[in-house]
């Protein structure tokens, strides 16, 4: 019987249905234009892009250009890829353009959908970023969809790790740039550590389309991107402490699996104090509760978490002697990603790996704050409605369910719950054997590498052929996914490994054709293609007759969304399929989040071994438990964002000021304003307002003026003069400091001085910001304890971080003023020494090339294109070039990037 809500929905339609219906007239308009665009030749499509671009630049709204742009893009895709976009794909593209999340089921062609809003927004010339979850997809999509953009007369670029700077800048300068979320975030941080605007890669944050948006903006929201530098080596301490942890008994600590925290009990602390003292780690007479013991306590707690919370082959693997983290949501390895605050080092000690030095944060940003930089943000995923509240609350993004092109034919079974893990796995193996016998391909979803390999062993014992896709086999990922839809295939995958690649019934035709051509290179490729297409059609039909892809999940995830993603691998584009979840009361989710009630009920029912309970209300009960977990995780992310927003406001100020300085030709006025502020603070400190002359610290001010301003004035005599007050003292100090810096500028030359001021200011900003980040990290780690004193930790953090920020700015002004006052031109001897060092560095960098080019010749003739009389060792022969002029050595580089660095 339908409830009132269901009846109302059937009569009036849901809000989502009404939203989709509202754009149907625009889609009809695009369809009406199709014959007109089909009549264009290839040059006509490119000319249409030029026309639309001019109209956009002349102020015509993109919404008004949308029908023509979408019609042009559809025709280009039809010609370049042989794919004609369905109406539902146009609807998805339209909502992306409007800054929404388009929820589109697996196999509905999200990659093609992204080209429509990307093309439309690319007309402005301000750049569009299409964001994917891994480098493979970024490169694949840029090459694949790049054909469409080329047909439209637009440029496409791809950004990837360790890409040469020049190539990266060119990629960002394209109309459409494909990149991973990680690389975009890191490039943003790197750009804000550059020395000049010309060195920056990104050119702004205009419009972004985020593929698998739930994975990036929800799952990874709590993970900050950090650029870090090494700090002191404490590997001996990690190893020493790691030897103590195996001695710890269960009553010495408490473990909270929900929050993944481990803490020592009072009894455990007593045991630790005794053991650490005996081992010589804790100095004699020192207690764990002493302030001096903070570092040791931090390391011991990390070691406990490494042993009791983090499990090998689940959260990480050991490969080539290194601890490599595994993404808990995708099952993929994350090389290069490290846990912070010494936790990674603790795991390295546990596994006996080489301990890498701890790092200090140089710059950081969370995805939550990075993606909020964009003027317009859109996203695509197969599952977003369960997190619609979070998308709306944090990112201001609405979620629109896009209808499928064909009705979903997949059968979704109710969950089967067993008493024990053994019973569950026995049933799974039996079910896989039945499906395999009739030729139905099976995709088995597991939650960890360990469990995927354990299930693999069970299938081997049962003589069932299978493939395993986890972090260890990531190189074969594309091949394994391509074969997963073949007749009788059995594929075990961790969570969502292979996400982003469709599992096609009968296997991936293109892969099969490439393999056949490679196996017989002398044969006619067209003949092979025709033969393979016929064979594939037969195989595809056989798989459909066997029931399509069977997705069999071995556990429920904390998030319903991850479960829905796994389920969505089956039944793409109206194909038949089936999905089942096999659970046990020993599963992590069931155990942690209360399986006691269910266990009692199963006892009451008198269930026998091997029997399962299968009922819709079990599904409802589990979904309620998952919804609770999702709500708790959302609250954590929301609270973390409030803390990060405090730092984000400060980050925007610092990065904004830094960019202004990089873009300014002359910052002499900025340097003078800083110096004047330092002088005012100095006078306030040593000649406090409303005080008499005999209360002034004139000797302290004289010393401060010498140290900070580089000037020596008879300040001690000012106290005896009539009419000298704060204002007069400030004027005298400012005048003397201005004269001193003017004389210094004359020695260096105006252009050189401006360059020095800029470099000193940028370097000092970076140094102070790094120190400030470290201070904020420490504040963040302790401010939670203020709650015990009935004080709001967030308000305390806001207040103190603002005070720390002001203190950082004061320190910045003082340091810049002092550095500029102390800097001196190089003597000829120092210049020669610097030259020798540079020659050594150049030789080391150039290697054999440097030796070959030198060829035993003298300095003068080593530069055949140099200006007349040029001698490398004698700057007086260089002709006084400007920083942006060509270098006099004839290298073709700008002076500032060549010999100008010596100045």
Curated annotation (Swiss-Prot):
Q: What is its EC number?
A: 7.4.2.8
Q: Which top EC class is given?
A: translocase
CDD domains xref list? DEXDc_SecA (cd17928), SF2_C_secA (cd18803)
GO biological process: one example: protein transport by the Sec complex
Catalytic activity entry: ATP + H2O + cellular proteinSide 1 = ADP + phosphate + cellular proteinSide 2
Q: What does the entry comment about cofactor binding?
A: May bind 1 zinc ion per subunit.
Detail the disulphide connectivity of this chain as listed in its UniProt entry.
none
Name the residues that bind ATP.
89, 107-111, 502
- PROSITE patterns named in the record: SECA, SECA_MOTOR_DEAD
Q: Which InterPro entries match?
A: Helicase_ATP-bd, Helicase_C-like, P-loop_NTPase, SEC_C_motif, SecA, SecA_CS, SecA_DEAD, SecA_motor_DEAD
Residues annotated to bind Zn(2+):
887, 889, 898-899
PANTHER family membership:
CHLOROPLAST PROTEIN-TRANSPORTING ATPASE, SECA INNER MEMBRANE COMPONENT OF SEC PROTEIN SECRETION SYSTEM
The protein's matches in HAMAP family, at most eight in alphabetical order, are given as: SecA
Tell me the subunit arrangement. Monomer and homodimer. Part of the essential Sec protein translocation apparatus which comprises SecA, SecYEG and auxiliary proteins SecDF-YajC and YidC.
Any idea what this protein is called?
Protein translocase subunit SecA
Protein's organism: Jannaschia sp. (strain CCS1)
């Amino acid at each position: 019987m339908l409830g009132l809500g269901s009846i109302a929905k059937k009569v009036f339609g849901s809000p989502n249905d009404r939203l989709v219906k509202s754009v149907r007239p625009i889609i009809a308009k695009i369809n009406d234009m199709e014959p007109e665009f089909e009549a264009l030749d290839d040059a006509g499509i490119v000319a249409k892009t030029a026309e639309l671009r001019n109209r956009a630049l002349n102020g015509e709204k993109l919404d008004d250009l949308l029908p023509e742009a979408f019609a042009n893009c559809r025709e280009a895709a039809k010609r370049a890829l042989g794919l004609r976009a369905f109406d539902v794909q146009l609807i998805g593209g339209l909502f992306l353009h409007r800054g929404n999340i388009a929820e589109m089921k697996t196999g509905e062609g999200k990659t093609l959908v992204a080209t429509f809003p990307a093309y439309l927004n690319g007309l402005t010339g301000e750049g569009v970023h299409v964001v994917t979850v891994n480098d493979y997809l970024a490169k694949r999509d840029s090459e694949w969809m790049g054909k469409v953009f080329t047909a439209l007369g637009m440029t496409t670029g791809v950004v990837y790790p360790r890409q040469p700077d020049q190539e990266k800048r060119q990629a960002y300068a394209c109309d459409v740039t494909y990149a991973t979320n990680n690389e975009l975030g890191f490039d943003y941080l790197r750009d804000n550590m550059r020395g000049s605007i010309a060195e920056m890669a990104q050119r702004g944050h205009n419009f972004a389309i985020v593929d698998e948006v739930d994975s990036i903006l929800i799952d990874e929201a709590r993970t900050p991107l950090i650029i870090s530098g090494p700090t002191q080596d404490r590997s001996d301490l990690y190893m020493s402490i790691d030897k103590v942890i195996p001695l710890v008994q269960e009553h010495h600590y408490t473990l909270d699996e929900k929050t993944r925290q481990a803490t020592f009990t009072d009894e455990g602390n007593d045991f630790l104090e005794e053991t650490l003292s005996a081992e010589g780690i804790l100095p004699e007479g020192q207690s764990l509760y002493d302030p001096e013991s903070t570092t040791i306590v931090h390391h011991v707690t990390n070691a406990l978490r490494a042993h009791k919370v983090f499990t090998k082959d689940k959260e990480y693997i050991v490969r080539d002697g290194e601890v490599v983290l595994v993404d808990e949501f995708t099952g993929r390895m994350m090389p290069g990603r490290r846990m912070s605050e010494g936790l990674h080092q603790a795991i390295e000690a546990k596994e006996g790996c080489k301990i890498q030095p701890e790092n200090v944060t140089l710059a950081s940003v969370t995805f939550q704050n990075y993606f909020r930089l964009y003027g317009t943000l859109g996203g695509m995923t197969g599952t977003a409605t369960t997190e619609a509240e979070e998308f709306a609350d944090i990112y201001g993004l609405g979620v629109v369910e896009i209808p499928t092109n064909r009705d979903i034919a997949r059968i979704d079974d109710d969950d089967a719950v067993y008493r024990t893990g053994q019973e569950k796995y026995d049933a799974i193996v039996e079910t896989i054997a039945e499906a395999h016998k009739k030729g139905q391909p099976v995709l088995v979803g597991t939650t960890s590498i360990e469990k995927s390999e354990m299930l693999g062993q069970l299938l081997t014992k049962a003589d069932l052929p299978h493939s395993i896709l986890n972090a260890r086999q990531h190189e074969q990922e594309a091949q394994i996914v391509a074969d997963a839809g073949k007749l009788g295939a059995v594929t075990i995958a961790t969570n969502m490994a292979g996400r982003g690649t469709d599992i096609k019934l009968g296997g991936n035709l293109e892969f099969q054709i490439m393999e056949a051509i490679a196996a017989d290179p002398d044969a006619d490729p067209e003949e092979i293609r025709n033969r393979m297409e016929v064979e594939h059609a037969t195989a595809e039909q056989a798989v459909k007759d066997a029931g399509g892809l069977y997705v069999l999940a071995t556990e429920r995830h904390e998030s319903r969304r991850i479960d829905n993603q796994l389920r969505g691998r089956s039944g793409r584009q109206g194909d038949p399929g089936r999905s089942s979840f096999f659970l046990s009361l020993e599963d992590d989710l069931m155990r942690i989040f209360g399986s006691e009630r269910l266990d009692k009920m199963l006892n009451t029912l008198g269930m026998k071994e091997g029997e399962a309970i299968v009922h819709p209300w079990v599904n409802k009960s589990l979904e309620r438990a998952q919804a609770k977990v999702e709500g708790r995780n959302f609250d954590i992310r929301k609270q973390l964002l409030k803390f990060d927003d405090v730092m984000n406001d400060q980050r925007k100020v610092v990065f904004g000021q830094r960019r202004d300085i990089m873009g300014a030709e002359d910052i002499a006025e900025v340097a003078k304003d800083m110096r004047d502020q330092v002088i005012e603070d100095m006078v306030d400190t040593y000649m406090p307002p409303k005080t008499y002359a005999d209360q002034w610290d004139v000797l302290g001010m004289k010393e401060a003026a010498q140290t900070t301003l580089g000037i020596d004035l008879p300040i001690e005599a000012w106290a005896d003069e009539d009419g000298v007050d704060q204002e007069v003292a400030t004027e005298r100090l400012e005048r003397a400091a201005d004269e001193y810096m003017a004389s210094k500028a004359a020695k260096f030359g105006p252009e050189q001085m401006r360059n020095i001021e800029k470099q000193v200011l940028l370097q000092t900003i970076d140094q102070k910001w790094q120190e400030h980040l470290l201070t904020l990290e420490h504040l963040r780690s302790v401010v939670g304890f203020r709650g015990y004193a009935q004080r709001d930790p967030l308000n305390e953090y806001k207040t103190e971080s603002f005070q720390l920020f002001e203190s950082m700015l004061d320190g910045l002004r003082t340091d810049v003023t002092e550095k500029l006052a102390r800097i001196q031109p190089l003597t000829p001897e120092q210049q020669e020494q610097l030259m020798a060092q540079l020659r050594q560095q150049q030789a080391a960098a150039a290697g054999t090339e440097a030796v070959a080019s030198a060829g035993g010749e003298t300095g003068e003739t080593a530069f055949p294109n140099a200006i007349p009389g040029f001698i490398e060792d004698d700057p007086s022969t260089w002709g006084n070039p400007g920083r942006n002029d060509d270098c006099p050595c004839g290298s073709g580089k700008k002076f500032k990037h060549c010999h100008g660095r010596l100045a």
